[in-house]
Each structure stands twice: as C-alpha cells, then as structure tokens.
Amino acid sequence: DALEAGDNVLVAAPTGAGKTVVADFAIYLAQERNVKAFYTTPIKALSNQKYHDLVETYGPARVGLLTGDTSINSEADIVVMTTEVLRNMLYEHSMTLDALRYVILDEVHYLADRFRGPVWEEVIIHLPQSVRIIGLSATVSNVVDFSKWIEAVRCDTTLVVSEKRPVPLEQHVRVQADDHTEPELIDLYRRDKDGNQTDKLNAQLVSRLDQLDRKAAKRRGEQRPDRRKGGKGGKWNDHSRRPERHTPRRWAVIDELNFLGILPGIYFIFSRNGCDQAV
C-alpha cells in the first residue's frame, strides 16, 4: 500500500523474512507503469546473483547489469548495479535516470560503514524527488532514526520492522581435543524447559572447554590453578602461556556437517590468501 501511495519504504527484517517481496512489488509497479527500476547491491557478486534471478523472472530483454567491469543491456527497464555505479550516474547526470522511478537499495545498512557509507548517503540525497526508495536490511541498529532521516531528506517514508525469524538462528561450537578423538557439537546457548534457545551461555560448553584447557596444560607439564582460589598475578593471566586449543582440519569439519545432514554451508575464511590456500 505504501509503495502504491507513493511513499518510500524501509524494511528491516531477518534473513528469510520476505524482504525481497517488497522489492519485487516495486519492480512489478515499475513494469505496470512503464518506468524504470534500479536494484543496487554493495558487491558485484550480489549484483550478478540478483541479475540472474531477475532474468529468470522477466527475461534477458528486460533486465540489465552494471558493475565496475560488466555492462549488459544498460538501458533495460530493470537494471541491477552496485551502489557506486548509481552514485556515478547521478553525478554524470546520465540520461538513463530520466525514466527512473524506483530504486531498491539492498543491504542499506552499509550507510553506517565508515568507508563506503557516504556512497549510500549521496545516493539517497541526490536521487530525483520523483524516485521512490526501497531500503532493505536485516541489520539496522537505529532503524527508526534512519527512517526519519530518509523522510526528512526526501518524502513520506513507511517503516516495516519484523524481529521474527522464520528460520531460527541456532549457534553451536565444535569441540574436539585432537584429531584422534570424536568431535562434539555443543549448543552455544542454554535451552529452556521447552527446548527454546535462551540468551545465556551453555554451562556444558564452558565446562567442556575448561576441561580441554586443563588437559592441554597437563600435557605441557603445567598445572592450572583453581580459579576459585583467586589471584591476579599468576602465569595463567598471561594469554600467551595458555594452552592452545585444537584447531580442526577444514575437511574434518565439512565431513562432520555432511554426516549430520546440515549441508550445504558456508565456510568463512577471513583473508583472500587463506581462501586460495583452502581451495
């Protein structure tokens, strides 16, 4: 209703909660009204994925893609691009913007990024007033203030917030003494009597990790003092002297996830070099 009434819309909802339905409706309205819709993402990989998704729905003739090094059907009715590309188009006063009426800003929480945030800010400020903005995010900490700011620099903005997770987020810790012992997958948080996850750390996990630390210390000929006796100056306050916990091999983790039937999954490695070595 808000989009049909001409409002901007900001959607803050967990992953899988249906944020893209709002974006899809904006694209539908653009097609019905014979105007253009842009779909922006923060990275090329997301742009490429969204481009292929939209091509499946609307066909290659109606969908374009613009990233730093790719240009496909740039004058299409629906164009997917990185946010930086849209910012550059605004500063260049591109003719492509003439029929633009809807802009979907996916991952709009990037506005808070200290390095790239100004790009989102410039886009929101400099887009023509005839354009309606649809902001999508799963993580906006100050979503009410953000919505008010958009309304202040543009026009009426409808805020849609949902905190319910259609797919519950469950967190576990993989614990293993060494490559010769069976791994354990222990809940990070306690569960209540109904089996629901709470926000309190799982005492079983803390106890198991403490047990592994003591065993590791014993193997190194060190004796860990009882924490209940206190004391702040002991060698165990030196983090560099604490026994290192076992780091499982990647293939072993994947094998276990496969055995538990919870693949596919994403294995995060926080460096490009590490990713190259893992392959």
Which sequence ranges carry the predicted segments?
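Conserved P-loop/Walker A NTP-binding site and adjacent catalytic elements of P-loop NTPases
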Residues: 1-175, 265-268
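Conserved interdomain linker/interface between the two RecA-like ATPase lobes of SF2 helicase motors
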Residues: 125, 132-134, 139-279
